[in-house]
Design a protein with these regions (language model features):
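Structural/interface elements that position substrates and couple domains in central-metabolism enzymes
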Residues: 2-487
Length: 487
């Protein structure tokens, strides 16, 4: 059973220290580990300065540790060396800059040397999906191999990205042991610690909001982890019985959300069919503490929620378990961009009062990021929305996002313009579609949209501002253009 453990001086000084001294070398436990980390003797290497690694490095820097930031991207290394982060995560650039000033932040591109120079190595590189929907562990395997080449006796390693259950013990740990010639539990310590952050408040999540979930390759690894993590996780640690369980736990978090978003999308569609406003029903239903209806939307994006179901489906296929609900939920959410584009085009028809002519139309999409408040475009539903509009031959697609200045992935699309100028994006457009719930979009008025019909794919606009004939929203029932029946 999971348990929350908070380590304090009294516990270490009394019975806990006697137990721990029998499990691990007596000279590196308790306050000794904390002292060596804060003094800089035990350096912490963060592999991957991306959306997970950058806030993790920042949290350790803020705790007083000496951190080695490791990244293979020359652009990322150059920015970090100047005290800047390539991602606009609050507090990260400030932590980098302060760390450099205090000579506690080092930036490496050499993964092996970073392993040689550090005590605690945190693997924070992403695990993506291949073209066929399988986990792409290329980056993790590369880092594991290079850590192994520089590994020393007594070192600690933690794998942080979400992975299919069994990845750490069946793949990553054997690679490290092979490269290093060392054995986990006897010579070094291996942990799995799934990241649990929400972009836009990542440092706060690490430091204040959640306990660190950890599991070890054995008792020694786990005990070391229980001493290290409370140095930055003020909520302490929550231990689980084994690494495979910790890997599974993180996937369950994401799948829960994906399936419930799919449920919300289906219920929104049902409410539209019977002429009922889903949003009104949702608010009333969620007043009961056992109901947690999620928000429907134009699509599910990011590197987490749409990815984790695929990891479970990949693993379940190997285990010969049919996870039908997860499949259906993923299918529903993947179909939402196409469904919403069809509904948005109906608004265009209603305004023009004649046949829709795609080759003469300009469409404005509000949001390139996968959700509001972030600049992360990974698996953004906007890409699929673009494809759907281009299938019907739209002349020009404009995209506005207050946080995304450029996106190389858009180079593969024709007649697509990305701008940070909202007025320019809306000028003389024929149709507007809200995709990301950036806060500035919630205050849009018909004066700004110049009378163009607008489809709210996130349910954030003030409906009182818009004439029903020119306004559509997921789950609005018959309080919108056309009859109650839709789709």
């Amino acid at each position: 059973m999971a348990s929350v453990d908070k380590i304090d001086d009294q516990m270490i000084d009394q019975d806990f220290s006697s137990q721990l001294s029998r499990a691990i070398p007596p000279d590196i436990f308790g306050n000794e580990i904390a002292h060596r980390i804060i003094s800089g003797e035990f350096k912490i290497a963060i592999y991957g300065l991306g959306h997970v690694g950058s806030p993790m490095a920042s949290a350790w820097l803020r705790a007083g540790a000496t951190v080695i930031g490791v990244d293979k991207s020359p652009a990322v290394v150059e920015k970090a060396s100047k005290g800047k982060s390539h991602i606009p995560e609050p507090g990260v650039s400030e932590a980098f800059s302060t760390g450099l000033t205090l000579d506690r932040f080092k930036i490496y591109s050499d993964q092996v040397q970073a392993s040689r120079d550090s005590y605690f190595k945190m693997i924070c590189v992403p695990v993506l999906l291949s073209e066929g929907g399988c986990p792409d562990l290329t980056a993790v395997k590369e880092v594991a191999t290079n850590i192994g080449k520089g590994l020393k006796k007594g070192d600690v390693i933690a794998l942080n990205p979400s992975v299919p259950p069994g990845t750490t013990e069946d793949l990553i740990l054997p690679m490290i042991e092979h490269e290093s010639g060392l054995v986990a539990e006897n010579d070094f310590y291996m942990l799995y610690n799934p990241e649990r952050i929400y972009e836009g408040r990542a440092i706060l999540d690490i430091e204040e909001r959640y306990p660190a979930i950890i599991a070890g390759a054995g008792k020694r690894s786990l005990e070391i982890g229980k001493l290290i993590y409370p140095l930055v996780f003020k909520r302490g640690v929550l231990t689980v019985s084994n690494i495979r369980a910790a890997e599974t736990e993180k996937l369950l978090e994401g799948v829960y959300r994906d399936v419930n978003i799919a449920l919300a999308n289906e219920l929104a569609r049902y409410c539209e069919e019977i002429g009922v406003n889903f949003w009104e029903c949702k608010e009333a239903a969620n007043s009961q503490p056992y109901c947690h209806l999620h928000n429907p939307g134009v699509g599910v994006g990011g590197a987490c929620i749409p990815v984790y179901p695929q990891f479970i489906l990949y693993s379940s296929a190997q285990a010969r378990v049919d996870c039908e609900m997860i499949k259906v939920g993923r299918s529903i959410n993947a179909a939402m961009p196409a469904r919403c584009v069809k509904e948005a085009i109906k608004l265009f028809d209603n305004k023009k009062k004649n046949e829709f002519v795609p080759s003469e139309a300009t469409v404005t999409l509000l949001g390139m990021a996968f959700r509001g408040g972030v600049s992360d475009t990974r698996l953004s539903p906007t890409y699929e929305v673009i494809k759907e509009f281009q299938k019907v031959g739209i002349r020009e697609i404009r995209i506005h996002d207050p946080l995304v200045r450029s996106d190389p992935k858009l180079n593969g699309f024709q007649n697509v313009i990305l701008t940070s100028d909202l007025a320019k994006a809306l000028k003389d457009t024929d149709l507007i579609m809200v995709i990301a719930d950036h806060s500035q979009y919630s205050n849009l008025t018909p004066l700004q949209t110049d009378g163009a019909p607008i489809y709210d794919g996130r349910g954030i606009l003030n409906r009182a501002f818009f004439d029903n004939s020119n306004y559509g929203m997921i789950g609005m029932g018959n309080n919108r253009v056309g009859a109650a029946r839709r789709f």
